[in-house]
């Protein structure tokens, strides 16, 4: 499978997701109040997992692996928490939540096929919580059109690059983080050293 999860995942309806979110966030607020905002991130996560188990929010899984493959390329992602097989929780200890954090969680939703996630930042004086949601399914992400009228097929390398990117999108779907597609292309070319200066591009006036 192009995208393989290390555990079974069950997408939640919005109502069920918010019900779990309410219970989990109550525990997170309690932990933040008891231990303060400078507790190490790994200890925060341990405490969240322990309290979820005490509250019978099962199963509680941590560091869930998602493996993305194409040909001999493979990349692993690890999700912070999966509670009740469908509640995705990502914890941060940053000065503030940033677009990169939201993009990361959205990427996880695309990879898992889930529709909702909770993103939490524990470092500020008051806990930051954001919902990240998408209506895009894997099927929708694989339904795309390629616009290549301005692409220059002026070499075998250029043709290979276009065909490879399209093959990756067919395998994984569109809208995953750009760095993933870039890493795959670089790997399939033989690595970073071989990739640099390998392609001949059209002059700027033709782009």
Where are these regions (language model features)?
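Interdomain/boundary linker segments immediately adjacent to catalytic/signaling cores
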Residues: 1-35, 135-171
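A generic secondary-structure micro-motif detector
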Residues: 18, 38, 94-95, 175
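Long, highly charged amphipathic alpha-helices
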Residues: 23-27, 47, 103-107, 184
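Active-site metal-binding core of divalent-cation-utilizing nuclease and nuclease-like domains
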Residues: 31-86, 125-137, 150, 154, ...
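Nucleic-acid nuclease catalytic cores
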Residues: 88, 92-139
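Short secondary-structure transition/capping segments
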Residues: 107-115, 163-173
């Amino acid at each position: 499978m192009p995208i393989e999860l290390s555990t079974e995942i069950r997408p939640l309806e919005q109502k069920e997701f918010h019900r779990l979110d309410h219970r989990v966030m109550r525990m997170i607020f309690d932990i933040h109040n008891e231990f303060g905002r400078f507790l190490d991130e790994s200890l925060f996560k341990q405490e969240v997992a322990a309290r979820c188990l005490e509250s019978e929010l099962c199963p509680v899984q941590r560091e869930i692996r998602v493996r993305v493959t194409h040909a001999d390329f493979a990349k692993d992602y690890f999700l912070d928490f999966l509670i009740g097989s469908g509640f995705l929780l990502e914890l941060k200890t940053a000065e503030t939540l940033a677009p990169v954090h939201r993009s990361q969680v959205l990427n996880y939703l695309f990879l898992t096929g889930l529709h909702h996630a909770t993103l939490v930042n524990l470092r500020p004086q008051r806990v930051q919580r954001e919902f990240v949601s998408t209506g895009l399914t894997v099927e929708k992400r694989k339904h795309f059109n390629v616009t290549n009228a301005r692409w220059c097929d002026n070499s075998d390398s250029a043709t290979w690059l276009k065909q490879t990117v399209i093959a990756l999108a067919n395998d994984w779907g569109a809208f995953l983080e750009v760095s993933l597609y870039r890493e795959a292309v670089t790997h399939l070319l033989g690595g970073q050293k071989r990739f640099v200066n390998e392609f001949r591009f059209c002059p700027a006036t033709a782009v």
